Amino acid sequence: MIEKEKFERHLRGTNLSENTISSYMFAIKQYGEQYDDITQKKLREYKVWLIENYKPKTVNLRLRAINCYLECIGKEKWKLPFVRVQQKSFLENVISEADYEYFKSCLKRDDETFWYFVIRFLAATGARVSELIQIKAEHVKLGHLDLYSKGGKLRRIYIPKELQNEALSWLAEKQQESGFIFLNKYGDRITTRGISGQLKKLAVRYDINPAVVYPHSFRHRFAKNFLERCNDIAFLADLMGHESIETTRIYLRKTATEQREIVDTIVDW
């Protein structure tokens, strides 16, 4: 028997985000639709089914959920090994610095101040969009935001001085002294989905490739720019909130466009 309620209580006793909890519960529900109990044989069959039907990253996400469930019910020895994900030799769909600067100038020109600060904060702090919407006026005044990661580790998101001064002026114009700074038209905190959808619309308006305009793209831009100006990957890993420096190493790679430009410049034979 699959103990879904027990698992959900277990998850809610951790520091996992709501999105992660939902994802893990979905995986257990999916397993439960095929099998009515947990055995090593059925776990292996489920893994084979996942591999046949999903991409490696999704397979590993499901396996991570299953392994967490196995911990919950005291069956750690049955944990399933992850499948190997073939890493690409380049970063995909990262907004270029030129497009980022162009995007900022367009938003400023058209008085799209709210969206100007959305992309400014994402690209200048390296915040995830789920972290961005937690920023308050108090954090802007302070110059940083402290958050706790999934493992309970403290992460500080710094707001650079130039951005801080700009944002303080914006808040003063709005006469906002406290509270969340990124609100929707109803005065509620904007959702991550709301940000993603509007960024795509703005990309189309300004003739920027929509494939490179999404919240995490600006976090990638932050990491790329940081490494180009300060080649300290350990420091960047801390700023990004990465558990392992290996995760941060991807930013040492060039984008596909950068690779093409280098090859076109160098290869003349």
Report residues per predicted region:
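Conserved catalytic core of the tyrosine transesterase superfamily
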Residues: 1-269
